[in-house]
Amino acid sequence: MCIRDRRKEGGINLRTNFDPLKEIWKNRPAIPENPVEIQPMDFAGETAVSKIARVRKALRGVHADGMLVSALDDIAWTLNLRGTDVHCNPVFVSYLLIASDKVSLFVDEAKLTDEIRAYLQEAGISVYNYNKVEEGLKQYAEYNILLDSNETSYHLWKTVKCQEIISQNSPIPAMKAVKSEAEIAGYRRAMVRDGVAMVKFLKWLLPAVEAGGETEISIDKKLTALRAEQDLFRDISFDTIAGYQEHGAIVHYEASPETDIPLKPEGLLLLDSGAQYQDATTDLTRTIALGPVTDEMKHIYTLVLKGHIQLELAKFPDGASGTQLDALARECMWREGLNFLHGTGHGVGSYLNVHEGPHQVRMEYMPAPLRAGMTLTDEPGLYLAGKFGVRIENTVLIQDYKETEFGKFLQIESLTLCPIDTTPIDVETVSYTHLTLPTKLEV
């Protein structure tokens, strides 16, 4: 029995045009009117017209005449536009309706400069006010419309009165996941700048902690300031996780004035951070010894490092799923009855959302195939509640490896350029391979 039938059976009427927050959140801010910006071709590598043509081709393949795009990063990528409406994510509040004969952008028109209007007009994109999306959908009564149930609100789903609703995943995330040559070049440039900021930070950190007065929040501010010195810096890509000692065992910890603690010249600091540069998005984690560490810390740190390296050295068939690779990062931990409960890797946007799909590396089955040109994170970890946590993360690129009679094979290249702390390594338990991974930046 579907949810609609259950509601009828129970006498429940679902009002999808009612916003309960309007009654509760009295001082709710309005939708931002921040201006939209063009993502230059030097960074995008493909025009909006070309991307729309690819989307239309994919729609024809499933006998759809059009689709509603609700995911903000999909809209930004398709149109080569960026915004600042969402914290840490360079997107803008909007809807996009791509049909076989028309493309309509529904957005607060106050966001659009004359330059943006001319750009959209040249690309054949009509602009309508954000709150006109329902009217726009009603014009397609004779069409077969694709709606992605993961992204489309039930209210808009119910609004669509067309020949047929094709309920399928949007084709855009899979297109967006494979980076253009220009985007890959942007990652390489941005990683150098981000690496410079990180190396400056690491060189500053230990003396600053030794001198006293540094806390989880203060070092976060220091790192952000160093990144802001770099060319093309726009923002951080997510709120920094700076977890010292037992706070490092809280996977998604975020320091607040109530939880902030001082750093001491001992133990481990887990630092998960990233930046938005106009030519790429970065995401990396380093676990740093601030002074003497225990044998237990060394053992756990070394297991995580082994898992991280094991995944980074992987060679695998084109089209393999992230689930098939996930065990590579966990096997050395499993041998000791240890595990971590978050994903091992996620896609990373190109000056877009730091978390991107559809591909992931995780234990749960993720059928999305891995292809050359995709970016991923490699971030295994181990967390001992009340004690400490360890995570080591690079952003990586999937590349062609070789082709044999058994098909095409892929490999992984690390894009992140930041030293991994060797102080906590238990050198008696690692191999030559573990100790000789190259890095271009040194403290």
Protein language model features and the residues they cover:
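Conserved small/polar residues in nucleotide/adenosyl-binding loops
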Residues: 1-3, 433-439
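Short acidic, glycine/serine/threonine-rich loops at helix termini
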Residues: 4, 26-30, 78-83, 108-109, ...
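Flexible, acidic/His-enriched mid-domain "rim/lid" segments that flank
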Residues: 4-93, 98-106, 128-233, 245-247, ...
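Short, compositionally biased
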Residues: 7, 281-298, 389-402
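Acidic/histidine-enriched ion/cofactor-binding microenvironments in catalytic or ligand-binding pockets
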Residues: 88-92, 97-100, 249-278, 356-403
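Short, basic/aromatic beta-hairpin or loop at an interaction surface
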Residues: 236-249, 344-358
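Glycine- and charge-enriched low-complexity intrinsically disordered segments
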Residues: 408-435
